[in-house]
């Protein structure tokens, strides 16, 4: 009998806190970003959005890319300055981005490193034991089938109970205990969002798994207690964040115009 919580959750926390897991960083820093075939190294779904984004960014001059990245990284640094938080005490930054944006992300990594921050780039959670609804926190690409993702947003209803919740909290606590130093030097997320996706109206189906009342209570209890564990190791008043957003090609024919607006 094994719920695999220890493996999947422990590894997920390591992904979020350790700069030693460099799968995505290596793709960004070591690939020829002029050749869009680098996108397929991720093993993710690659659509016209990702390809056209990468192609468009390849037309920018180095100065333009540096300027884009500087707006992003300086926004991050100034957030610490405004909050009077000592950024020099931090060693890592989590970069969240949309595939196709690697040319800008590469410049941002170099700028963050000049601030003394190593990048942490991880994929959005795919295991239901780590994922919340349809949230995609981390690097991601276009969702190939939004209805399918919506249909399975509460698959944990098939197995969630009090025992599993307690097990997850136990594993979470131990994972943070093992990575206490990494948590203490984590500066916070630097997020690159996208906008302009085609509207999607999900269709509900009675066959879809949904949490019952008891499971909803368990979920609320888990979120409350897990947040307390995270806050014990990552002091929120010593972290900051930044968010910037760019359009994606499916926004329409004026994509390039909107991008530069």
Model-predicted segments: where are they?
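Active-site bordering "gate/hinge" segments
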Residues: 1-261
